[in-house]
Amino acid sequence: MTADKEEDAVTAGFLVIGDEILSGRTKDKNIGFLADYLTAIGIDLCEVRIVPDVTARIVEAVNALRSRYTYVFTSGGIGPTHDDITADSIAEAFGVGIDVDPRARAILEAHFPAGQLTPARLRMARIPDGADLIQNSVSKAPGFRIENVHVMAGVPSIMQAMLDAIAPTLKTGRKMLSRTVDADLPESRIAEALRDIQDAFPETLIGSYPRTTDGRFTTQIVVRSRDEAIMNRAADAVADAVREAVGQ
């Protein structure tokens, strides 16, 4: 579809890092939030990957995503424990060094009482060379940004706070608009017409979502475009096709 190739589109990839996500022990709550957040400010989330706490896998994913999209966001793996290896992996992906950052250390020293900035906690101040810090208003330990990669915590409340901190710095594109058409018929009855409408309106993205309503198969059709006039024409065509199919 051509809509996701528009020159004014700002794109993003999201990398979720953590064995606990892949094992099912922790249920991810960040993907949906980030998708909603980015859509609202005019950034298209185009790809999500989930990788384990394995340096080679993180490096591979980061390098693939950062070369493909305007922005990359990561969550997870920047805490104080031995398996929090995201910062080191990002440094390796960019080919830079990593050490305790004086700015990050000062933040942690101001946050923890005297004598409580343990070596484990100090790990959270290790930042790749050349990176900027991302403010953490919840628990203070910062995330960081290096080039187009934004590295954030996995805890949802902290990730959301970090996202709020970086949002003003992000370039945004024209927002994707949407209009919904409900069809009181199964998806198969409208599939061919939707394909024809999609071909007629290449600037749109048309998705159909089958549902069950009061024991009947129904379909919700969502038409998306950055151009409101084109979106409305395509949605009107969908509504006409639905009425015709219902009348058959």
Residue map of PLM features:
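N-terminal small/polar loop signature for handling phosphorylated ligands or for N-terminal nucleophile
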Residues: 32-85, 90-92
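Glycine-rich beta-strand-to-loop/alpha-helix junction loops that act as flexible
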Residues: 17-19, 74-82, 153-154, 225-226
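Glycine-rich phosphate/diphosphate-binding loop of Rossmann-like nucleotide-binding domains
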Residues: 4-48, 52-53, 229-233
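Short coil/turn connectors at secondary-structure junctions
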Residues: 9-12, 67-69, 128-130, 139-141, ...
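Conserved short beta-strand edge segments in small beta-sheet-based binding/regulatory domains
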Residues: 241-248
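An accessory alpha-helical subdomain
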Residues: 148-241
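Proline/glycine-rich low-complexity loops and linkers
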Residues: 57-63, 84-173
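Short beta->alpha linker loops
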Residues: 50-53, 103, 122, 185
